[in-house]
Structures are given as structure tokens and as C-alpha cells.
Amino acid sequence: MDGRIPDRSGSISTPVEQRTWLIVPLYNEAQVVRGVIESARQTFPKVVCVDDGSSDASAAEARAGGAVVVSHPINLGQGAALRTGLDYALGDPDADYFVTFDSDGQHRTEDALHMVRMLDSEPLDIVIGSRFLDNRTKLSPIKRVVLRLGVVFERMSSGVKLTDAHNGLRALNRHAAESIVIDQNRMAHASEIVAEIGRNELRWAEAPVHVLYTDYSKSKGQSVWNSVNILSDLFLK
């Protein structure tokens, strides 16, 4: 099974971009999310944002950008938002592929499209973006060390030998999206997804991606806090 369904009303002849949903967790990103969605929809017209209890105008800005918005009444965490978004997108019978995509401008649609095309042309269930397959992504020393530690721990715990275990840019076919169970609401969902790849014996590959650490994301202290969250995930799970 390659994730495509040959007898489904000619879906194979439909451009891959139109058979893909972007799943975008959203929390207090009103400043940038409209531009991110408008840019992404130039390639992928189907975008669902899960507003995870934002206290700003994130939901309105995402809608203005052309996304479908599903809202959590309170902040549940990124894992919960991904689960809600995948559940929504799986309800589209014409959808073959699902991409988890950040709302703050760090992910590039060019990378997402390459990953989806890999799913469409190769016997794969899931493609994980990696910042370590080339030198385009500029990482701080502490971030690089933490991510390398994450790789070691994930290999030991799941047997899945990724080079970048905590990259949020992922492309899944329908089989993978239906098979992976996300019970961890917050940052531990990243490790959970890797474990689910091993548990379900999903066919996986990595693709080089360029993650853009912008002035905006740095101003929020995201890189530092993500490193702390990853360490907490590794040692407390």
C-alpha cells in the first residue's frame, strides 16, 4: 500500500497539492499567521488551523488568510492541536496527504511540497524533515546539542534511526495519519509520533529542510524554550 487509492474517482490524476491538507497548530501568532497562511495557500489550498486557546486575534487572522479554523476553548498544547487538525482533515475523503506545519513562518512550503511528492512517488508512509541532512539551518550550539541528545534517546527508545527527532515539519499519507495515535497533548507528542512510527512499522524517510529561525521567533524566545521542553520530554517521559 502506498497511501494512494487508485479507484477513488480519479484522485491520482488530481495534482498532489489539491490532495493535501496543511495542519497548523496556532497559539498567539496574530502578528504573523495571516501572511504564513496566505503564502502557504499559494501551494496548498487546503489549510486547517487549530487555534489552541489563543488570547489574541490569531483565529481571525488565520481565517482572513484563507484557512479553515477549528478552535479549542482553552490551551491544550501542540499535540492536542495536531490531533484535532488531523481528525478534521481526515474527514475529507479526497485527502491523501497531511502535513504538520508551523504557524510562525519557520517552515517552507517548498520543503513541504518536496516531502509530499516523495510520498506520492515512493513506497513511504511518512516523511520527516531533518535540519541535519544539509547545512542550511542555523542552530545555536545549545539547540544543536539538545537535538542530538534527542536523536540518541529516540533511537534507544523507539528503534527509529532519525537524524532529527523533534522536527515539526512532517508529511503523512492517509494510512500513517490514521495509524498514529497522539495522546500527549504538549511537547511530548514529538517523541510519541516517533514511537508510533516504530510501533506501526510505518515506512519512513527523512528529507532535508531549511528551518527559518526568524527575528520574530527569536524575539519570543522560542528556540530556548523549545530546547528546555525537549529536555523535559526526554528525561521525564
Predicted feature locations:
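Catalytic donor-sugar/metal-binding loop of nucleotide-sugar-dependent glycosyltransferases
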Residues: K161, I182-N185, V194-L212
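Short beta-strand-to-loop acidic/aromatic patch adjacent to the donor-nucleotide binding site
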Residues: D94-D104
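N-proximal low-complexity "stem/linker" segments adjacent to membrane-targeting elements
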Residues: M1-S39
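Short loop->beta transition adjacent to catalytic acidic/histidine clusters or analogous donor-positioning motifs
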Residues: E17-W21, S39-V48, A57, A67
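A conserved acidic beta->alpha catalytic loop
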Residues: D51-A60, G105
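Conserved sequence signature across two-component system core domains
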Residues: L26, V50-G53, H72
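Acidic helix N-cap motif at the loop->helix transition within catalytic regions
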Residues: Q31-G35, D56-G65
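Acceptor/aglycone-binding surface of glycosyltransferases and processive sugar-polymer synthases
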Residues: V68, P73-Y88, Y97, T109-M187, ...
